[in-house]
Amino acid sequence: MSWTYLLMLLFLLPYTGDAVPKINDGEDRVTVNVGDKVSLECRDAHLVTLAFQKSGLMKKPRDLKSRPLNNSETDQFFVIIKADLRHIGRYICTNTETQENTSVSLFVKDPARPFLDIPFIDVTEGADTVGMCFPTDPDMDIAIEKCDGSPLPENFTFTTDIEAGITIKTVQLAFDSCYVCSGNKSGTVKKSSTFSIHVKPVPKKVPTVFLSKSRQLVKTGEPFEVTCAVLDVFSTVKAQWLDVKEGVTKQANFRSSNVFSYNLTLKSDGVPYSESRTFTCQAENAIGQVNATFTLDVIDVGYVNLTVLENTTISVNAGDNLVLKVYIDAYPHPDDGVWTYFNETLLNTSDHYVATKDEGNNRYVSELHLIRLKGTEKGVYTFYTTNSDDDASVSFNIQVKTRPEILIAERTSEGTLQCVATGFPVPAIQWYFCPGSEQRCTDYPPLSPVNEKFIQENSSLGRIVVESTIDVNDLKKNGTVQCVASNEVESAYSVFSFAIKEKLRTHTLFTPLLIGFIAAAGLMCIAVAVLMYKYLQKPKYEIQWKVVEEINGNNYVYIDPTQLPYDNKWEFPRDRLCFGKILGAGAFGKVVEATAYGLLKEDSRLTVAVKMLKPSAHSTEREALMSELKVLSYLGHHKNIVNLLGACTVGGPTLVITEYCCYGDLLNYLRRKRDSFICPKFEDNSEAALYKNLLNTRDMGCEGMSEYIDMKPAVSYVVPTKTDKRRSGSFGDQDVSVSIPEEDDLALDTEDLINFSYQVAQGMNFLASKNCIHRDLAARNILLTHGRITKICDFGLARDIRNDSNYVVKGNARLPVKWMAPESIFHCVYTFESDVWSYGILLWEIFSLGSSPYPRIPVDSKFYKMIKDGYRMMSPECAPLEMYEIMRSCWNSDPLKRPTFKQIVQMVEQQLSDSKGNTPLPYPVSHVPLDHAVRINSVGSSTSSQPLLTNSDR
């Protein structure tokens, strides 16, 4: 690189008053290239100095050497050996005596660096920026822009100067950002490196002060701690605990660019005071100061105080819910307390549960929730709690109002009529007489009783019985006597019919006839009792699906299906149903194939399944079918459950119209497909020998014939094509009546089995999201329709469980024991987790192609012991290892460790995706949104769930 010598002769003319030094040839700007040598000569009659000004600061460069010029005592010679960007600025030659000066600007051009680098600029809000975007080439037009190319902020104004660079006027907080300088010379644009402008906010209000607590109660000698948090826009804020010299720790940090946090913690390991004190935290900035006060209450000994806002004597109607609430003011922290009823501790059950909460400031609340109070549950309920220093208790006297009940209504041997009644409040008994035979006599004047007395039973809060009698000898004619027991709740009555007869002469045949009559009556009573016992032993039809209303620990409160609303939009005209063949029949009713005309749209025909009861059905069974209809309408539509299409509830017996599933139940479908199943070989199948001949044997002697019953076709059977079999609809227009389950001619493989598992998991996830427990999940209760779509159903109506070996007698019920979780078998507990266990058994059924669970193991005492000891079935031959691991997780003895159905959907979906080689799934994934409370945890500590009914529904 060639050297360029620049001689700047600064002549200071002989002092003649106000003469000012001039630059040679009047030049005030000099431009050189980077690396050039620069020489400066400053001449004057007096001693001169050379200064360097940059960014408004006077600072002499370290490498700027000076020496006398030509041995002059006044003139100076300055040399920059190798010019670089550090030397850019204004050089000022000053007469030390007169302070007159002249100056020249030096620019050092560097093509690689068009601007001087600046990493960041700190500026106070409202001020102007200085010292940025200095160009190295004075011939450039300079500007400023944001790093990302976005527009400059609103009100962003700036001025440019070739020496001073760019000055931003009146900086605002919105200007805090990243910027870059740009220069344009002859159409060529060059940019600087990026830099940041940090805007320091100016306080506009006093600081904000928060205390971690405003008050604390301690005993003498106990520790305490309180933190004062101060928030301001800048770190110049001052904060302190007044009149506190020790025990204060400080911590400061920026929460964001415009918020500064300052924490002062006041702490003591042991309160040395014997009385209460206050402490003040003070914060101050340029606007002003603010104080926050903390009160420390000091006591010598702890306490427990109980408060009840309502009356402790409470009357409530039987069947109502009641909440007893006690407010606890205590220090130190009390125990949870206990509720007792006649000195017996109350534990959480379906009839009552306890809820506690901490309201802060040493105040707590304990609530006893009494659900659907019975008349026998009146009495004294007591709450007791204690801490290390004190204890207290409070009692409630609960009176349950019950309707009157007539216990005895008879004619005594003394010729009187006796009426004994009970209830709360104690009922009043009135007697009425009317001539002839009547149902009621209350329109006649009351009779005066001969005697009336009260009988107290058990304790002072036990049942009170009132007894009243009248003398029938005072009645002169035949008629009806009515005993009426009334209180403010309701009335009850009993009627006596009698006739006044002449005294008859005793007949010699009277005694033998009486004995014969009594003997015949006794035999008849015995026969009636036997028939009644057998009737009660018969299984009753009830819907298996249960909708959970509330959960407290392990106790489930199920909603009464009769309380669910029924929307008349489901009504469908009976005359538009054309019934076909019977699809299934059981002890209580049957399912019939039918054609519905105009169900979905006008002039359409749709094959449906219709549930109906037998003509001999009792009122309880009719009510159960109506409950099933209400539950199905409450659940709503889902692809993987048998959906409700309509109903007929007026003008005849109740009919429930549901989707028709052409392939029948999954259990028999799998058995029919055994010969055509393509089974890959998996490793580590310990039970392979058990299923070695599975695909070669059709006569398996399988248990439980719960499928659609086999029947002869009424018309020629039409074999659908492959295209028909794979269509995805759940139902469609059908022109051919089918009396037996259709069959597709496609083979079955492992991917199909995984898909069945996936669809059932989706359906169960949907039921769980609706707080619905199935209680009888098995392959026999899964139906299959076109496209091999599985649908969960409840087949209890059309199944004769008395002749189904899958249902084992246990107590007075027949239960599917091999599908039940241990807690359901041994404790009669049905939860979402017990459904997960049953799902694991269903997986085993699917991958064993319809074999019965626990093969060759009868349900007896040994079976129950095996389940208690943790016995689990081995993997079916056709099950991938991953699917067997899902089965095992469903069979965890701890219900809390079983996966939820949402997790099962994800696990099986992954297996289905892997079996397809990570290609898109052929079946749509319909994840169920949990639009109300997340799935209720039946074994955890969840308190309560969202109600399923509003008050108006009840």
From Swiss-Prot:
Positions carrying Phosphotyrosine are: 556, 558, 691, 708, 807
Functionally, this protein is described as follows: Tyrosine-protein kinase that acts as a cell-surface receptor for the cytokine kitlg/scf and plays an essential role in the regulation of cell survival and proliferation, hematopoiesis, stem cell maintenance, gametogenesis, mast cell development, migration and function, and in melanogenesis.
> Topological domains (Cytoplasmic): residue ranges?
534-954
Family annotation (Gene3D superfamilies) = Immunoglobulins (2.60.40.10), Phosphorylase Kinase, domain 1 (3.30.200.20), Transferase(Phosphotransferase) domain 1 (1.10.510.10)
Q: What class of enzyme is it?
A: transferase
What is the protein's species of origin? Answer: Xenopus laevis (African clawed frog)
Every copy of the Ig-like C2-type domain together lies at: 21-109, 118-200, 207-299, 308-401, 404-499
InterPro entries named in the record: Ig-like_dom, Ig-like_dom_sf, Ig-like_fold, Ig_sub, Kinase-like_dom_sf, Prot_kinase_dom, Protein_kinase_ATP_BS, RTK
- Ranges for the Protein kinase domain? 577-912
Q: What residues bear carbohydrate chains? A: 70, 101, 155, 184, 263, 291, 305, 311, 343, 348, 458, 478
| UniProt modification remark | Ubiquitinated. Rapidly ubiquitinated after autophosphorylation induced by kitlg/scf binding, leading to internalization and degradation.
Official protein name in the record: Mast/stem cell growth factor receptor-related protein Kit
* Gene Ontology BP annotations: B cell differentiation; cell migration; Fc receptor signaling pathway; hematopoietic progenitor cell differentiation; Kit signaling pathway; positive regulation of cell migration; positive regulation of cell population proliferation; positive regulation of receptor signaling pathway via JAK-STAT
The residues that cross the membrane are 513-533
Record-annotated residues binding Mg(2+)? Answer: 556, 781, 794
Task: Kindly list the places in or outside the cell where this protein is found, as annotated in its UniProt entry.
Answer: Cell membrane
Pfam families found in the cross-reference section: Ig_PDGFR_d4, PK_Tyr_Ser-Thr
